[in-house]
Swiss-Prot record:
Protein name as annotated: 1-(5-phosphoribosyl)-5-[(5-phosphoribosylamino)methylideneamino] imidazole-4-carboxamide isomerase
Matching PANTHER family: 1-(5-PHOSPHORIBOSYL)-5-[(5-PHOSPHORIBOSYLAMINO)METHYLIDENEAMINO] IMIDAZOLE-4-CARBOXAMIDE ISOMERASE
Annotated family: Belongs to the HisA/HisF family.
EC number, UniProt record: 5.3.1.16
Organism this protein belongs to: Ruminiclostridium cellulolyticum (strain ATCC 35319 / DSM 5812 / JCM 6584 / H10) (Clostridium cellulolyticum)
Gene name of this polypeptide: hisA
Compartment(s) of residence: Cytoplasm
A Pfam family of this chain: His_biosynth
GO cellular component, one term: cytoplasm
């Protein structure tokens, strides 16, 4: 299982939100690039970077910073947030990113998702963000009619190899992941499931490994010190 340290960017700064709320922002650093270097130096094998401004506006607001992170680090970097067309996917991949996460666009623009999976194959991951079991879109501010598992099965049938599954109710709350939901998702599909949301201590990461997910994104817990990244990597 891979541990993905998360870097969320608003206004060029490294931040964390609580339950996806843009009105509840904590700034953890002025330089996302320096933060990325820190996680790499502590042994991270892959980095997860989100343009939160982009997720909300539908445009790549922090693209230059994100490409700078990818060019600075030796480890692979995946990114999402505001990627609504193939041109943006291409810009990020040519800028050094290893994997692109499609969230809202995967739900609302099926043609684009099909084209992206056909063109870029394993370099595309689908972000499935669930609120009360339903898929949330537009920076988590709206919900769709899909259940998370239904949508996952559909994108798998279209050729997706990786999904990032976030339980919004747990995100940024440090109250533990939704193990039942993660296990249900991992059992329902054969593609890689990366779990996100709620990790608050090392035990959560070990418990998630038992659900069958292939990776876990850790955000707030490594910023507050609740989880020691080096220790967590060694433990799994």
């Amino acid at each position: 299982m891979i541990i993905y340290p998360a870097i969320d960017i608003i206004d060029g700064k490294c931040v964390r939100l609580q339950q996806g709320s843009y009105s509840d922002v904590t700034v953890f650093g002025d330089s996302p690039v320096d933060m990325a270097r820190k996680w790499e130096s502590l042994g991270a094998g892959y980095l997860h970077v989100v343009d939160l401004d982009g997720a909300r506006s539908g445009k790549s607001e922090n693209a230059e910073i994100i490409k700078q992170i990818a060019k600075t680090l030796k480890i692979p970097v995946q990114t999402g947030g505001g990627i609504r067309n193939l041109e943006t996917v291409e810009t990020y991949l040519s800028g050094g990113l290893s994997r692109i996460i499609l969230g809202t666009s995967a739900v609302s623009n099926r043609e684009m998702l099909i084209s992206a999976l056909k063109e870029y194959k394993g370099k595309i991951a689908v972000g499935i963000d669930a609120k009360d079991g339903k898929v949330a879109i537009h920076g988590w501010e709206k919900t769709s009619d899909y259940t998370a598992v239904e949508f996952a099965k559909e994108v798998e049938s279209l050729g997706a190899k990786t999904i990032i599954y976030t339980d919004i109710s747990r995100d940024g709350m440090l109250k533990g992941p939704n193990l039942q939901a993660m296990k249900e998702m991992a059992d329902s599909v054969s593609m890689d499931v990366i779990a996100s949301g709620g990790v608050s201590r090392l035990k959560d990461i070990i418990d998630l490994k038992q659900t069958g997910v292939s990776g876990v994104i850790v955000g707030k817990a490594i910023y507050t010190g609740n989880v020691d990244l080096k220790e967590a990597i060694l433990a799994i």
